[in-house]
Amino acid sequence: MRLVFAGTPEFARVALDALLAAGHDIPLVLTQPDRPAGRGLKLTPSPVKQAALAAGIEVAQPRSLRLDGRYPDDAAQAQAQLRQAAPEVMVVAAYGLILPAWTLALPPRGCLNIHASLLPRWRGAAPIQRAIEAGDTQTGVTIMQMDEGLDTGDMLLEHRVPIGAADTAAQLHDALAAAGGQAIVQALAALQAGNLPARPQPADGVTYAAKLDKAQAALDCAQPAALLARRVRAFNPVPGATLRLPGLDEPVKVWRAQALDASAAQAPGSVLRAGPEGIDIATGSGVLRLLELQKAGGKRQPVDVFVRGWQPPAHPLKSE
């Protein structure tokens, strides 16, 4: 099929590669403008832009698609490029810009979105992280016919993906990205064959995956250990769970932790023990064992290495 692709990060790049491998005609790709990245804050193209240029595809990078918005010239130019591309359908994956009504109406077969959850659960910006944080054991990707709502369009196809007990957001991201690429190729094949029925999203079971906030990554030891361990996994690698350890001026990042089936009489935040097997912290319910940490400005270290250079004073931990 002749299509336009809109996406920005690695999740979307995987889908673009799958569409190209399936032989779809993609004359135009939309992606976010280049952003500063790295230590030197050098302007860096998105993964999708890099893949598109490598494939010889024209790239558009409007700052907005709203003709009546802050960047009307950008939107008008993108509109002209889309009309010139004349796609049958538009595929959207983690693009990062709101698609106004004119965009949704332009392709004859509309706009299909690859969403990283089993809708209507986890509509919104951070479905991967919120699924882990909530303790879900299963998630997936939904191919959705886009409308003007927030992930409210009709569902066309689902691929289910299990969430392992130790999966981090990075690991689940990669699994869902691969599933998304497979799902959109399957959906377009069904669409071409006239066999892609749409189902309205049910009214029950709607949840929203709020955007990640760096402040939420600070672990509060008054909360249950099981929740804290899930948050460590959910916020790995971004924004990274943090905790203030006594004796250190800056909070440390916690890359791995586990909830122990144990109780503690000490106040939440108390260091119960520290050794090569882990740093055990009293919480509001249960014990959290820290397994991999990183000091500010340092490297990630397994706990047996970390504890050699840190001795816990006898007072509770504090959240960031």
From Swiss-Prot:
Q: Which PROSITE patterns match?
A: GART
Under which main EC class is this enzyme filed?
transferase
User: Which InterPro entries does this chain map to?
Assistant: Fmt, Formyl_trans_C, Formyl_trans_C_sf, Formyl_transf_N, Formyl_transf_N_sf, Formyl_transferase-like_C_sf, GART_AS, Met-tRNA-FMT_C
Q: Which Gene3D superfamilies match?
A: Formyl transferase, C-terminal domain (3.10.25.10), Formyl transferase, N-terminal domain (3.40.50.170)
- Which CDD domains does this UniProt record tie to the protein? FMT_core_Met-tRNA-FMT_N, Met_tRNA_FMT_C
Task: Quote the cellular component terms of the Gene Ontology held in the record.
Answer: cytosol
Q: Which residues cross the membrane?
A: none
Enzyme Commission identifier(s): 2.1.2.9
Q: Where does (6S)-5,6,7,8-tetrahydrofolate bind?
A: 117-120
- Keywords of this protein's UniProt record, alphabetized? Protein biosynthesis, Transferase
Give the molecular function GO annotations: methionyl-tRNA formyltransferase activity
Record field: catalytic activity: L-methionyl-tRNA(fMet) + (6R)-10-formyltetrahydrofolate = N-formyl-L-methionyl-tRNA(fMet) + (6S)-5,6,7,8-tetrahydrofolate + H(+)
State the source organism's domain of life.
Bacteria
Signal peptide (residue range): none
So what family is this one in? Belongs to the Fmt family.
Concerning HAMAP family, the annotation shows: Formyl_trans
Query: What is the role of the protein in this entry?
Result: Attaches a formyl group to the free amino group of methionyl-tRNA(fMet). The formyl group appears to play a dual role in the initiator identity of N-formylmethionyl-tRNA by promoting its recognition by IF2 and preventing the misappropriation of this tRNA by the elongation apparatus.
Q: What is this protein called?
A: Methionyl-tRNA formyltransferase
